[in-house]
Curated annotation (Swiss-Prot):
This is O-fucosyltransferase 29. GO terms for molecular function: glycosyltransferase activity. Residues 540-549 have a biased composition (Basic and acidic residues). Belongs to the glycosyltransferase GT106 family. Substrate binds at residues 292-294. The gene is OFUT29. One of its GO terms (biological process) is fucose metabolic process. It holds the Pfam family O-FucT. It is a single-pass type II membrane protein.
């Protein structure tokens, strides 16, 4: 900046002191200069001075532009750092982060994002066969829209998986509002319900079918997939889940968000049942937590972990594992140490009580068929008597949906999304999808177990006092509570950490704005350190012999 300033001062001195510019010894004003003077020297000098001034201004703008941009960047970083440093030092408010109000979802189209290519001008029709359960298929549908955009293709409404473990024959329109899906994305991608008959009749061969590698890059689609599409005009991609790279440019990431958080809307029937369950929970309690218990037989078998059920459990889970040909043999103890085992319902209850949730907290349990049934759920019920499920709250409304696991999962999705706090016992697809959505919707409190550290605590909990255990749980859960400071670029799946779609408001710290929250929090923290509020008794020890941690 010293060099720039000196250049500027020199140019000013030249303008004010040059005898040539001031007409020799006369103090003539600049507006009185004669630009068409007969004196060639004055004309030459004026041209030189103008050029020098322009050069000086260019140099100044070059340097100051960088300085200003750097200062702005450092200012933003310091503001963000001060916010995050404060959040790390303060006690954990289990119900919400007071810094969440400074962040919001933003997925608007950029100025240079071109309109969708119309059907008649596209490179062909893209058929997508999604794979897995409801939320795994959701990732595939989201990425299918982006791939269609990359290929300049017309997307046919994706087909859902009818042959996986869940055996649900629901079609797209049975779960999602298909007309809204098509219309809301009309500016991004052209979507049709089916390939036109005239196109099918004109085809000499059936649609070309292939499966792309997982995490395929944009270049892969352009180099390997696009030539097939342009040649065959109709292309089907099968087993389409996580088939697109995590790292895309910002416009494409924002398109992912528009699909996942706005275009994929459940049908009115499903949405109505889900919101009835939410209203019935709200009628009983001002706020409630939703616990997603992924403790179904398929999850336990896939994990390769031991949950204390003895030889019977090992035989049953081993039989289920045969459905996956490529699963390796795993050491259950090593998997637990690595934090790869889903928490048991009992462990989830202990974690919640240690964090500060009291036994009068209302919980909604989102789950399918729990392995071990009521016996497995009993410890969680004892820790949280206000225990509810969709079957308990909307039994009559659910009857038409009972044969369809994906539609039932959609009800759990809605209630979990609307809850004040969302907790999961695993790192599965629903956990990731909802964690990302709740971040996008304002960093609503989302608790993910730090399974690696918690597993060691659960194994040693009988060796420590409850207060010590609770303190250690709080410590190891920092960074796993859904706070904004957990947001690190490049971390995890984009569906879980949609960083390109999160914007930040200016930060200001109001110490008096959270007095009521701190009172609630201090009461909860007091209760979490009281061993009389949890069942660490001989009854618990007996249960642990059946389901050891």
């Amino acid at each position: 900046m010293g060099v720039v300033a000196e250049v500027w001062r020199s140019s000013v001195r030249l303008l004010t002191n040059s005898p040539q510019l001031n007409g020799g010894s006369h103090k003539s004003a600049l507006w009185k200069w004669r630009f068409f003077s007969a004196q060639p020297k004055r004309t030459v000098m004026w041209t030189w001075v103008c050029g020098f001034m322009l050069f000086s201004l260019g140099v100044i703008s070059l340097f100051t532009g960088h300085v200003v941009s750097h200062l702005e960047w450092y200012s933003q970083q310091l503001s963000k750092r001060s916010l995050l440093d404060m959040s790390r030092r303060e006690p954990i408010d289990v119900w919400k982060s007071k810094y969440s109000k400074f962040f919001y979802g933003c997925s608007e189209r950029g100025r240079n994002f071109l309109p969708a290519v119309q059907e008649q001008s596209s490179n062909g029709y893209l058929l997508i066969a999604a794979s897995g359960g409801l939320n795994q298929q959701r990732t595939g549908i989201t990425d299918a829209v982006v791939v269609a955009r990359i290929l300049n293709a017309t997307l046919v409404v994706p087909e859902l998986d009818h042959h996986s473990y869940w055996k649900d024959d629901s079609d797209f329109s049975d779960i999602f509002d298909v007309n809204w899906f098509i219309s809301s994305l009309a500016k991004d991608v052209t979507i049709v319900k089916r390939v036109p008959d005239r196109v099918m009749r004109a085809m000499e061969k059936p649609p070309y079918t292939t499966r792309v590698p997982r995490k395929s890059t944009l270049e892969y689609y352009l180099d390997q997939v696009l030539p097939i599409l342009t040649r065959r005009h109709v292309l089907q991609l099968t087993k389409f889940d996580y088939r697109l790279a995590n790292d895309l440019d910002e416009d494409m990431q924002k398109l992912r968000c528009r699909v996942n958080y706005h275009a994929l809307r459940f049908t009115k029937r499903i949405q109505s049942v889900g919101m009835k369950v939410v209203k019935r929970m709200r009628k009983m309690a001002k706020r409630f937590i939703a616990v997603h218990l992924r403790f179904e037989p398929d999850m336990l078998a896939f994990s390769g972990c031991d949950f204390g059920g003895g030889e019977k459990e090992r035989a049953e889970l081993a039989e289920i594992r045969k459905r996956w040909d490529t699963l390796p043999d795993l050491d259950p103890l090593e998997e637990r140490k690595r934090g790869k085992c889903p928490l048991t319902p009992h462990e989830v209850g202990l974690m919640l009580r240690a964090l500060g949730f009291t036994n009068d907290t209302y919980i909604y349990v989102a789950s399918g068929e729990i392995y071990g049934g009521e016996k497995t759920l009993k410890p969680l019920r004892e820790l949280f008597p206000n225990f509810y499920t969709k079957e308990m709250l909307a039994n009559d409304e659910l009857k038409p949906l009972l044969p369809y696991s994906s539609r039932l999962a959609a009800i759990d999705y809605i209630v979990s999304d609307e809850s004040d706090v969302f907790i999961t016992n695993n790192n599965g697809n629903m956990a990731k999808i909802l964690a990302g959505r709740r971040r996008y919707m304002g960093h609503k409190r989302t608790i993910r177990p730090n399974a690696k550290k918690l597993s060691a605590l659960f194994m040693d909990r009988e060796k420590m006092e409850w207060q010590t255990f609770a303190k250690k749980v709080k410590s190891c859960q920092r960074g796993f509570m859904g706070d904004p400071d957990e947001f690190k670029p490049g971390r995890g799946e984009f569906h879980e950490y949609p960083q390109s779609c999160i914007c930040q408001r200016p930060f200001s710290y109001d110490k008096t704005s959270t007095d009521d929250e701190e009172e609630d929090m201090s009461e909860e923290n007091h209760n979490s350190t009281s061993p009389g509020h949890v069942h660490l008794s001989s009854a618990d020890n007996e249960r642990d012999e059946v389901f050891p941690d």
